Amino acid sequence: MARTSSKTDSPKTGRLSGRFWKLLGASTDKDQARSMAQVHKAAEFDAKAADLDDEQLRKAARLLELDDLADSTDVPQFLAIAREAAKRTTGLTPFDVQLQGALRMLAGDVVEMATGEGKTLSGAIAAAGYALAGRNVHVITINDYLARRDAEWMGPLIEAMGLTIGWITADSTAAERRAAYRCDITYASVNEIGFDVLRDQLVTDVDDLVSPNPDVALIDEADSVLVDEALVPLVLAGTSHRETPRLELIRLVGELDENTDFATDNDSRNVHLTEAGARKIEAALGGIDLYSEEHVATTLTEVNVALHAHVLLQRDVHYIVRDDAVHLINSSRGRIATLQRWPDGLQAAVEAKEGIETTETGEVLDTITVQALINRYPRVCGMTGTALAAGEQLRQFYKLGVSPIPPNKPNIRQDETDRVYVTIAAKNDAVIEHIAEVHETGQPVLVGTRDVAESEEIHRRLVKAGVPAVVLNAKNDAEEAAVIAEAGKLGAVTVSTQMAGRGTDIRLGGSDEEDHDRVAELGGLHVIGTGRHHTERLDNQLRGRAGRQGDPGSSVFFSSWEDDLVMSHLEDNKLPLECDETGRVISPKAATLLEHAQRVAEGRLLDVHANTWRYNQLIAQQRAILVERRNTLLRTTTARDEIAELVPERYEEVKARLTAKDSETGEAKLETICRLIMLYHLDRAWADHLAFLADIRESIHLRALGRQNPLDEFHRMAVDAFASLAADAIEAAQQTFETAPSIEDEPGVDLSKLARPTSTWTYMVHDNPLADDTLSALSLPGVFR
């Protein structure tokens, strides 16, 4: 098997100059040298720490003066205590590079540490450092499994240093969440933290608040949370009586003929009706004009959404069907996007397409993007295996620097040059042949595919060829940790979508490392990618599964000119087609062209991120103003005071009835009534404002046809609408207080009409999801609760 290069870093990282790293926000050599000097000095205190009993070690940690982490002379002692505590509680002795990583996180950086280098332990030490400095720390993960696993694993270490630790999952009750947040360090997924922040915006009693004020966010898999999930808005929504999308329309669209009634573009990212298709729809609906003012924003939109669902959204690629329900697949992780759904019209169209009962629709009550959620924290830091490749986004959107941490042992993984084929069919044949060839030697193979359908097709062909293989994809993601842990066993062949199993180490010889030496002699884990991703960072994540902690390993990517990356970002007439008898492209330019396509794709994704951020930034600013007003109403007597000033006669009338028997109780009840009314109408006004913003965003791109700037127009309309929000809410509250009927035989007023919904879900809305070729609804799922 050909091996053309040895990498001691992720591909291309070794060629990045110090100046370029700085442009990406990387820490300077001076910063790194200072951190290493403190790590080396910590060794002087190791013996003293080892002589302390558990109680003495705990007291020593609590006596450290770490208020100013940048200048504290106690940092070396802290590192020595942390190393000793880790040794006693986890059986792991942190390497110097792990302590270096912890220090760079304490300096506010995102650290790049390769797979298997011990990020979890390094992050726990950094979290302990912040907590000992008096900060409240949220360790933010990508899912509930990792939040609980890491909290339970690192809990004894945290407690050995005199600190408290808690965790939150989707099953946690409100009381359990409050208890976890009261701890010095709280582990939770980004979704759960976001949901708690949103739900707190519906409480009407200060004692019902769950989420604390944000302080320190330490983010695991930082690139996934801060880049891949940055644009995902977590949305709190409530049940409503909005109309369900018309099923007759959805069924009608399903009967249309491709090419005759509708057409897709070359890369199958957009679909539109032909004239014949439009006439067929119009006739079926009684001769209407789809493009008339009456129908263009309603019926035509429904038709386009249904087309999108039927033609562009593919089962086992973008979603799976399980237990009579549609489950979305997270495009960057290759696993089920737990509790997620599309915007209602698209969700209903997909459900109808699959013959599944459509789920309930609703209205948005509040929303916050992951990016805005994280930017609430005064201090943000994190860790990942691929931070440098995300450096520009981290710097631009979070003002974060990146610190590359060297591996404890040199990375000796061999990365082969891409094998490029003219057609997908030729590529897939070559992939199967290559897997079989490597498997014959006993070397374990991990195959990374782009989607569920491809993983199952590769698995089917391997079984047919007599190669025993295990498939890991969104359909069996509950088993992923156990499956991926055995991917390094002798003779193992594991076919996996995207980054399934991320967060679980692949040890040579299997989880028990029984055949470690034998597998190492065979070359370690061999990673095969069945196509380049739209960002090099995801390629590097896949490659990084091999070569753990100085182990041997290898990787190779198979690509074709028919891959989505190439079709969307390269011109056909520039592709060399000369190939050998297997269909493999001979031209040495092939790999360079792939890299160019990837750079173009990355540029487009960055543009989309920046553009979406510009829309979301104003909404975030308006939300901050609303939250401040809401907190004032919730925590003070402002609601009562304003009502008393607005309607003094009615106020005194209600007050007299309430205080007739018990003055103190009556005053408290009156204050509660005023607060409930004010909060209800403020929340109602915000929900209406969000609905208005969603409506204008759906059509704002059309302003470009009139030579107007869509973003400027959106801002103008959003600012104008928000200007009257507070006054309108107060006026509505005044009217409610004046007109609310009295309760028979009881003092007070009837507030039964101010009932609040309880069902919540989240989803992502894009300006024009049916027309954007880089960020469509295919990759914009949301979370349903």
Swiss-Prot record:
The gene is secA3. HAMAP family: SecA. Monomer and homodimer. Part of the essential Sec protein translocation apparatus which comprises SecA, SecYEG and auxiliary proteins SecDF. Other proteins may also be involved. Part of the Sec protein translocase complex. Interacts with the SecYEG preprotein conducting channel. Has a central role in coupling the hydrolysis of ATP to the transfer of proteins into and across the cell membrane, serving as an ATP-driven molecular motor driving the stepwise translocation of polypeptide chains across the membrane. Its EC number is 7.4.2.8. GO terms for molecular function: ATP binding; protein-exporting ATPase activity. It holds the Pfam family SecA_DEAD. This is Protein translocase subunit SecA 3. It is a peripheral membrane protein. It comes from the Bacteria.
